Design a protein with these regions (language model features):
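Hydrophobic residues within well-ordered alpha-helices
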Residues: 24-25
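Non-catalytic, C-terminal membrane-associated alpha-helical segments of glycosyltransferases
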Residues: 55-62, 73-119
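Catalytic beta-strand/loop signature of glycosyltransferases that borders the donor
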Residues: 28-43, 53
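Short, flexible active-site loops
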Residues: 3-8, 38-46
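Short regulatory "switch" loops immediately downstream of catalytic or recognition motifs
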Residues: 1-5, 69-71
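Acidic donor-binding loop at a coil-to-helix junction in glycosyltransferase catalytic cores
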Residues: 3-20
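C-terminal catalytic/acceptor-binding lobe
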Residues: 19, 42, 46-70, 83
């Protein structure tokens, strides 16, 4: 039995799509990538803000690690939860998150991985 993980409440986690694909593969089916297909996605203005992208990337990375863990295909070692704030602080400086928006988003992505890997 599996529980598909996806967005709920204020969380922007989006592991549901990946979870579905992994379940399809485990059931013996095939999946495909078709670059000639296109999709028009109408996005509200508030979702084009750095603050939204920061939450989205953090929650997406956290849920991705959790989906991999659930399916026992996570290539990374779990980390102690008490180390997460220290790792985030170290990454803030290593990535220089204060310098520009891209660095800040990269830092938020790292934060999501740490949260997903914590026990």
């Amino acid at each position: 039995e599996t529980m598909i993980t996806d967005r709920s409440a204020d969380s922007l986690s989006s592991g549901g799509d990946n979870d579905i694909v992994i379940e399809i593969l485990k059931a013996g089916w095939s999946v495909g990538y078709f670059p000639e297909l296109s999709l028009v996605h109408i996005i509200p203005q508030e979702r084009l803000q750095i603050s939204y992208f920061a939450r989205l990337i953090k929650d997406t990375n956290k849920s991705w690690v959790q989906v991999l863990e659930k399916h026992q295909i996570n290539p990374w070692h779990k980390i102690s939860s008490w180390t997460v704030p220290l790792r985030k602080a170290k990454s803030w400086f290593k990535i220089a998150a204060w310098k520009n928006k891209i660095n800040y988003l990269n830092w938020k992505a790292a934060c999501g991985y740490y949260e997903g890997l914590s026990k």
